[in-house]
Amino acid sequence: MYTIAALYHFTRFADPADLKPALLDLCLAQGVKGTLLLAKEGINGTIAGPRAGIDAVLAHIRALPGCSDLEWKEATSDHPPFGKMKVRLKQEIVTMGQPDVDPRARVGHYVEPEDWNDLIRSDDVVLIDTRNDYEVAIGTFEGAIDPMTESFRDFPAWWEANKERFHNKRVAMFCTGGIRCEKSTNYLLGQGVEDVYHLKGGILRYLEEVPAENSTWQGECFVFDNRVSVGHGLVEGPHELCHGCRRPILPEDRNRPEYEHGVSCHLCIDETSEADKMRFRERQKQIALARARGEDHLATH
């Protein structure tokens, strides 16, 4: 059984590059795999491995400057969620492209999962999903507004174009684990919105703590590992990835004429050129050859 830990923490690292070697070495030594992002504004990522290995890595992160109160969310999987370990240096741990946004200064009001339903059912509350379009497509909260953004960078422009619709409304926001809402609520407060709320622990904590019979969640929640999606109780969902576009699809979508394993699906068939598809086919060939030799291929990670 693999323990999965999803974490983020906003702090201030003087030089993130100095932190990378020891963190990566520890993960490798402990058999932990996944991706961790380091930036001057903090750390973000998801890792998986044996219980003892995850505990060791979390203890190391909590000992980093300003990270003693690190929080994380856990789940389990009976198969490895990641193929390798990566520690990457970034400009932002979640990219919004707004230099003035600083969640350490202030964020919206945190709302516990058990109080979320009452808030979003209020007539004076507008509910906004801050995730990307392909994530929203497989599940969201009842009544939520989908900004239809392709990346989190698009959110500020969407807000600027639509903010008059929400005049005199309280704004409630949510995302997968909470990190995007740390920035989006700070951004809205900076734009003069007075009453801003966000779901503490994100969708994942809601699905873990709120029983399905009391839930206002509809569908599955996309996750950034080999589980692809989870439902109530964080039970692994039916979705899988199209490795041509990295979007979630259902098993029955593999029966569509547009589907070619590792190359295309009904969502991306018209988005790539024939040259792209030839490259994807060659990639799949190399993956198959590597597996036949009992090796991992980088494209599978």
Curated annotation (Swiss-Prot):
<feature type="active site" description="Cysteine persulfide intermediate">
    <location>
        <position position="175"/>
    </location>
</feature>
<dbReference type="InterPro" id="IPR040503">
    <property type="entry name" value="TRHO_N"/>
</dbReference>
<comment type="function">
    <text>Catalyzes oxygen-dependent 5-hydroxyuridine (ho5U) modification at position 34 in tRNAs.</text>
</comment>
<dbReference type="InterPro" id="IPR036873">
    <property type="entry name" value="Rhodanese-like_dom_sf"/>
</dbReference>
<dbReference type="InterPro" id="IPR020936">
    <property type="entry name" value="TrhO"/>
</dbReference>
<dbReference type="Pfam" id="PF00581">
    <property type="entry name" value="Rhodanese"/>
</dbReference>
<dbReference type="GO" id="GO:0006400">
    <property type="term" value="P:tRNA modification"/>
</dbReference>
<keyword id="KW-0819">tRNA processing</keyword>
<dbReference type="GO" id="GO:0016705">
    <property type="term" value="F:oxidoreductase activity, acting on paired donors, with incorporation or reduction of molecular oxygen"/>
</dbReference>
<keyword id="KW-0560">Oxidoreductase</keyword>
<comment type="similarity">
    <text>Belongs to the TrhO family.</text>
</comment>
<protein>
    <recommendedName>
        <fullName>tRNA uridine(34) hydroxylase</fullName>
        <ecNumber>1.14.-.-</ecNumber>
    </recommendedName>
</protein>
<feature type="domain" description="Rhodanese">
    <location>
        <begin position="121"/>
        <end position="215"/>
    </location>
</feature>
<dbReference type="InterPro" id="IPR001763">
    <property type="entry name" value="Rhodanese-like_dom"/>
</dbReference>
<dbReference type="Pfam" id="PF17773">
    <property type="entry name" value="UPF0176_N"/>
</dbReference>
